[in-house]
């Protein structure tokens, strides 16, 4: 069972359309689906809403702490509502997947993602679900061979190219049904469906 879906990103209009905010995009989509309005919740350090999705109540959260401090928001809401780490899905951008790809997994390392590192540190475990939304990598972008750390930072803080955005939007749509399966406790089917989707 999933009780909390967290979208990672950075607050503010200047970051809204950037690759790093892919997690926010999916949570916004889920809020619309569930007829919920994300509101500022100071005690949870972000925008939060309780939505009716897949015939159950699910909390949605967009931390307003900036990406690298996302753990504070996640742990604040999870502790308040007694939500266990394995009842949490964190939705985030993933450079190691091509734009338009999506993968679901439970546990594992942060893979260099500072938002995940902070969440793991605050929860005291890596045993939570991650929905990885592919945004591509600067080394695969035009003229991107040999991309260094600075290129990576610039890449995630820029909007995707039009064809990438279309692929990412299609992936967001494909994630909805598998998330519903996961929320109802059918993790195996959720992963099988998402990982074979085209």
Curated annotation (Swiss-Prot):
Pfam families: Pept_tRNA_hydro (PF01195). HAMAP family: Pept_tRNA_hydro_bact (MF_00083). PROSITE patterns: PEPT_TRNA_HYDROL_1, PEPT_TRNA_HYDROL_2. The record marks 10 as: Discriminates between blocked and unblocked aminoacyl-tRNA. This is Peptidyl-tRNA hydrolase. SUPFAM superfamilies: Peptidyl-tRNA hydrolase-like. One of its GO terms (cellular component) is cytoplasm. TRNA binds at residues 15, 66, 68, 114. Hydrolyzes ribosome-free peptidyl-tRNAs (with 1 or more amino acids incorporated), which drop off the ribosome during protein synthesis, or as a result of ribosome stalling. One of its GO terms (biological process) is protein quality control for misfolded or incompletely synthesized proteins. GO terms for molecular function: peptidyl-tRNA hydrolase activity; tRNA binding. Belongs to the PTH family. The record marks 93 as: Stabilizes the basic form of H active site to accept a proton. Gene3D superfamilies: Peptidyl-tRNA hydrolase. It comes from the Bacteria. The active site is at residue 20. Its main location: cytoplasm. PANTHER family: PEPTIDYL-TRNA HYDROLASE. It is found in: Cytoplasm. It comes from Cupriavidus taiwanensis (strain DSM 17343 / BCRC 17206 / CCUG 44338 / CIP 107171 / LMG 19424 / R1). InterPro entries: Pept_tRNA_hydro, Pept_tRNA_hydro_CS, Pept_tRNA_hydro_sf. Monomer. Keywords: Cytoplasm, Hydrolase, RNA-binding, tRNA-binding.
